[in-house]
Amino acid sequence: MIGHTHKDEFEIGYSNYAKQSFATANSMSYIAPALTPTSGSPAFRIYSLDPVTFGVLDFTEYSTSLESSTYQSASGPVWAPYYSAKATYGPLVTQPVTTPSAELSPAFWHNVTTAFEANDTAFQEYVARKSRGWGVSSCTGDCKTDEICQLRAAEAQYNCATVSPGIDFKRDEAQAKVKESECHGSKVAEMLRKIAKRVA
């Protein structure tokens, strides 16, 4: 279990990236969402593990609504189950994985991505769960292809994201599209924008 990206995601590793299949899927990265409400409602996961193999049997994601009247009250937020991985994704695969003792193996998750390719409703529901239903937009065409590619790219050299090198110092802030870090760990971009404004 690794992460964080502030989103509900996973990535599959393969013994042979040239022949990605359920047979070559050999590792998993579970990327949990954040308690920080920057990309959706706060959420956390509880994993169920096999006590002998330590394989993941299921996880349940819990979330709270930012719009709830109790969110910032003295009683605190109310956490409720958002979804179970096995209950949500288990029925999607050709041989449904629903029994409590069945592991959610890398092969299982590869088969889930195959189901996403064929079942657009299931894929769009996955996209909505990434942010716990917050700010959801449709992901079709290249977006869908890239997202499924990324789910199958646990090793960095197979990453599907397109990186544009360089720094863009546009003066027109309406045209500038700056991707902010959701963790707010670096203030360099903000500082450079302020300097550019003063120079302009």
Question: Residue ranges of each PLM-predicted region?
Answer:
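Active-site glycine-centered loops adjacent to acidic/histidine catalytic or metal-binding residues
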Residues: 3-4
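Metal-dependent phosphoesterase/phosphodiesterase active-site architecture
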Residues: 7-200
